[in-house]
């Protein structure tokens, strides 16, 4: 069974939950309270050094980065397939997560950081870690 470390407030967690549901995969949700800074717990940071959600554990392997998780889950659970067979359609499909990862998510992350979690992050990161996180 998959363990999904996630937060209901996380867009990235939501897209992984959506794929797990679509695939009919059995999974256990482990909620990480971002407002309380639970992502900075040393045990969680062993799984995800960037202290972000989601993270999955499948067959003892740690998988991070939500878009890569989706690709992984589509291969591990082939039915129903999420990726079309036709190369051009596969290309078109790839444009959406690329836009989300490169444009939308950084903007949302900046706002979320500024409004909701900067006090937690500032208390739990060194200045070098903050620079690396937002690089």
Regions found by a protein language model. Give the residues of each.
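GST-like domain detector, emphasizing the conserved glutathione-binding G-site
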Residues: 1-134
């Amino acid at each position: 069974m998959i363990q999904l470390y996630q937060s209901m407030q996380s867009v990235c967690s939501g897209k992984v939950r959506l794929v797990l549901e679509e695939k009919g995969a059995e999974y256990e949700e482990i909620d990480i309270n971002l407002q309380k800074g639970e992502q900075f717990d040393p045990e969680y940071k062993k799984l995800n050094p960037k202290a972000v959600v989601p993270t999955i554990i499948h067959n003892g392997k740690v998988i991070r980065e939500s878009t890569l998780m989706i690709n992984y889950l589509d291969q591990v659970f082939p039915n129903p397939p999420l990726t079309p067979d036709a190369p051009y359609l596969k290309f078109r499909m790839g444009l959406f997560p690329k836009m989300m990862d490169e444009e939308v998510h950084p903007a949302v992350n900046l706002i979320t950081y500024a409004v909701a979690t900067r006090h937690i992050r500032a208390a739990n990161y060194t200045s070098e870690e903050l620079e690396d996180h937002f690089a």
